[in-house]
C-alpha cells in the first residue's frame, strides 16, 4: 500500500515566505476542482471560494490581517460560508428555508463545508510542490472584509489561504503535534484530570525543546503558555454580531 498521501500530510507546515511567481489559471482551476470534490453535508455545498490576484484587494486584506504574506504570495483564496444561492432558491420556490440556513446548525454545516474544501486544496497544492498558510486573521475585521469583497447577505468570510512556491530561504518545519494518545479516545471520552495534566506536561516539554532548538535558545515557551496567551486575549468578540448581520444564526 502506497503511503504517499500519509507522508505528504505528515510533512505539512505553514509557509509564510513565497517566491514572486503567480499561480497559473490552470493551477488555480485544478486546486478549486480538487476542493469541490470534498464531502459536503446533505449535498448543500454551502461555501464559495473567492480567488484574489488583484494587488489592491490583497493590500486591503493585508491591512485587516496585518500579515505581509496576504499580499506576497502566488495566489490568495478566501473561503466563505455561502447560503446566498440557497436564499435565491428559497425566494424562487416561495418557501421558508431560512429557518434552516439561518440556524446555528446551518452555520456549522457551512463552516465545515468550507474547511473540508480548503483542506482538499491545501493537500493538492502541497502535492504540486506549493506551500500554503491558512489565514484566520481575516476575521480581525469581518465587516471590512465583507465590504472589500462585496459579500451579500448570507455569505460570511471564515478564513483565507495564501498559496505559492516557497521562497528559497523559507525554513519552516512541521511542529510536533499532540501525541496520538492525547487526542484519540477509544469508545468514549477519557476526562481523567490527572492523566490529562500528565499528558500536557509531557507535551509542554516537547514543545519547549522544539522551540529551543529551532531558535537557538531564543524561544522556549510551552504549549500551555501559548494557549494561555491566545485564549486569554479578548479578541474578535463581535463574531456573533457579525454573523447575525450576515443573516446567519437568526435562531
UniProtKB/Swiss-Prot annotation:
InterPro entries: Flavin_OxRdtase_Frp (IPR016446), Nitroreductase (IPR029479), Nitroreductase-like (IPR000415). One of its GO terms (molecular function) is oxidoreductase activity. Its EC number is 1.6.-.-. Keywords: Flavoprotein, FMN, NADP, Oxidoreductase. Gene3D superfamilies: NADH Oxidase. Pfam families: Nitroreductase. The keyword Phosphoprotein does not apply. Induction: By ethanol stress and disulfide stress. Its cofactor is FMN. It comes from the Bacteria. Belongs to the flavin oxidoreductase frp family. Reduces FMN, organic nitro compounds and disulfide DTNB. Involved in maintenance of the cellular redox state and the disulfide stress response. PANTHER family: NADPH-DEPENDENT OXIDOREDUCTASE, OXYGEN-INSENSITIVE NADPH NITROREDUCTASE. This is NADPH-dependent oxidoreductase.
Amino acid at each position: 500500500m502506497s503511503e504517499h498521501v500519509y507522508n505528504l500530510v505528515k510533512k505539512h507546515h505553514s509557509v509564510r515566505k513565497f517566491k514572486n511567481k503567480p499561480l497559473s489559471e490552470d493551477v488555480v482551476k485544478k486546486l478549486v476542482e480538487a476542493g469541490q470534490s470534498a464531502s459536503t453535508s446533505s449535498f448543500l455545498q454551502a461555501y464559495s471560494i473567492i480567488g484574489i490576484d488583484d494587488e489592491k484587494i490583497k493590500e486591503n486584506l493585508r491591512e485587516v490581517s496585518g500579515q505581509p504574506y496576504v499580499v506576497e504570495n502566488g495566489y490568495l483564496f478566501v473561503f466563505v460560508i455561502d447560503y446566498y444561492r440557497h436564499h435565491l432558491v428559497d425566494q424562487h420556490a416561495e418557501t421558508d428555508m431560512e429557518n434552516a440556513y439561518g440556524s446555528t446548525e446551518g452555520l456549522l454545516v457551512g463552516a465545515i463545508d468550507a474547511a473540508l474544501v480548503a483542506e482538499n486544496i491545501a493537500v493538492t497544492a502541497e502535492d504540486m510542490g506549493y506551500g500554503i498558510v491558512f489565514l484566520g486573521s481575516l476575521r480581525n475585521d469581518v465587516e471590512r472584509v465583507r465590504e472589500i469583497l462585496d459579500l451579500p447577505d448570507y455569505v460570511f468570510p471564515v478564513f483565507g489561504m495564501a498559496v505559492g512556491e516557497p521562497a528559497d530561504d523559507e525554513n519552516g518545519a512541521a511542529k510536533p503535534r499532540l501525541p496520538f494518545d492525547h487526542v484519540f479516545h477509544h469508545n468514549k471520552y477519557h476526562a481523567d484530570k490527572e492523566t490529562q495534566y500528565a499528558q500536557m506536561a509531557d507535551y509542554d516539554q516537547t514543545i519547549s525543546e522544539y522551540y529551543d532548538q529551532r531558535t537557538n535558545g531564543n524561544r522556549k515557551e510551552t504549549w500551555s503558555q501559548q494557549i494561555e496567551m491566545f485564549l486569554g486575549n479578548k479578541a474578535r468578540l463581535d463574531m456573533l454580531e457579525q454573523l447575525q448581520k450576515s443573516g446567519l444564526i437568526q435562531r
